[in-house]
Amino acid sequence: VYNAIVLMKIIGRPTWWTILLFIPIINLIMFPVIWIETLRSFGKRSALDTFLGLITLGFYIYYINYTQDLEYVADRSLSPDSKTADTISSLLFAVVVATLVHTYLIQPYTIPTSSLEKSLLVGDFLFVSKMNYGARVPMATIALPMVHDSIPFTKSKSYLTWPQLPYMRLPGIQNINRTDIVAFNWPVDTVYRFFDTSKRRAYKPVDKKSNYVKRCVGIPGDSLSIKDGLIYIDGKLLQLPERAKPQFSYKVA
């Protein structure tokens, strides 16, 4: 951490950037930025230097360090050199902020099933707060930001299955209560491909499994039973919201 703070001072960037280097997914964007900023701090500002720094995953910095006599540019301009560079910098900043919000604060979802049709309809768009119950730290550390399990318009995975972080969740501001509507990932270990008779299975990290939205009716420690279509918790009838109550009679015209 100390080395990262010193590096931020060398490249003339704020020390709080160090935090971004340790946030999964965000760090995949920040590391290339740091490589480029380090090169420019020693006068390497050409497009070729930038390309070599990116294509070698930063090892180009080690190469020029031992093969060239470089001078540190202490008073370099931190502003982009051109309108194109300014646009790229703005886009990167927007992606970093959006990924932070998307991963740890609020995420948009689309309702995939009709099980909550009295409250939510299939195809409805909604925003889900991750702060209330505590955001889960991404387990797939190498993945494209702002997408789920596949790259749009392709059938390719948007992530690598290795390396993976263990399951970890940040502290929340409230506990899950009965009758809360919650978004979660499909909990089973493997997923069968829909409409595929070959019984092939898709193995995914927990955070890349399909998103589902359901109503919570039981919490840890509850004794749950269903009698005549009604839910009982610890022997008492669960009081559901009006739109969540079972319907036993229908009017037929």
Each model region followed by its residue ranges:
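N-terminal signal-anchor transmembrane helix
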Residues: 74-81, 114-116
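Alpha-helical transmembrane signal-anchor/signal-peptide segments
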Residues: 107-126
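Internal/C-terminal transmembrane anchor helices
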Residues: 78-106
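Membrane-interface helix-boundary signature
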Residues: 10, 14-17, 82-92, 173
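Conserved AWS/pre-SET-to-SET junction and N-terminal core of the SET lysine methyltransferase domain
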Residues: 104-110, 204-205
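Membrane-cytosol interface at the C-terminal ends of transmembrane alpha helices
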Residues: 1-73, 105
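Soluble "head" domains of membrane/secretory-pathway proteins
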Residues: 122-253
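A structural motif detector for short, solvent-exposed N-terminal "entry" segments of globular domains
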Residues: 90, 112-113, 220
